[in-house]
Each structure stands twice: as structure tokens, then as C-alpha cells.
Amino acid sequence: MSTFIVVFLLLTAILCHAEHAIDETARGCNRLNKKCNSDADCCRYGERCISTGVNYYCRPDFGP
């Protein structure tokens, strides 16, 4: 049973790392928390490309 858990966690870590590597080169952002490069990128309706201090992410836009 513990071997199954270790294998499952390893596969999860590999998949998460692979998705992160893909997001590094992504220009547009189609889902919440996906990296974007500026306000000109295409976040979903109701989201804006907002700086988190280091990177930009699509976040809900609550108004001006």
C-alpha cells in the first residue's frame, strides 16, 4: 500500500512540474492563475492580468 502511495506522489509531482514548464512559455492566459505577460494578454471575461510582485497572473477583476 505504501509503495502505491509513493508511486502516486511521484507521478503527481512529475505531472505538476511538466505543466509548470509549459506555462513558462505561455503567452495567453485562459484560466485562473495561469501566467500572463501583460494586460494585453487574453484572460477570461471578468479577469485581469495582475502583478503578484514577481509574475503576472489572471485574477478576478472586482472593478476599477
Swiss-Prot record:
Entry's Gene Ontology molecular function annotations: calcium channel regulator activity; potassium channel regulator activity; toxin activity
Alphabetic keyword roster: Calcium channel impairing toxin, Disulfide bond, Ion channel impairing toxin, Knottin, Neurotoxin, Potassium channel impairing toxin, Ryanodine-sensitive calcium-release channel impairing toxin, Secreted, Signal, Toxin
Signal peptide (from-to): 1-18
Compartments, as annotated in UniProt: Secreted
Tissues with expression: Expressed by the venom gland.
Domain of life, per lineage: Eukaryota
Residues that make up the propeptide removed upon maturation: 19-27
One of the record's GO cellular component terms: extracellular region
Disulfide-bond pairs as recorded: C29-C43, C36-C49, C42-C58
Main location: secreted
Domain comment, as recorded: The presence of a 'disulfide through disulfide knot' structurally defines this protein as a knottin.
Free-text function comment from the UniProt entry: Voltage-gated potassium channel (Kv) inhibitor. In addition it may increase intracellular calcium release through the activation of nuclear inositol 1,4,5-trisphosphate receptors (ITPR) of cardiomyocytes, thereby causing an increase in the contraction frequency of these cells.
Family: Belongs to the scorpion calcin-like family.
The protein, known as: Neurotoxin lambda-MeuTx
Taxonomic lineage from the root: Eukaryota, Metazoa, Ecdysozoa, Arthropoda, Chelicerata
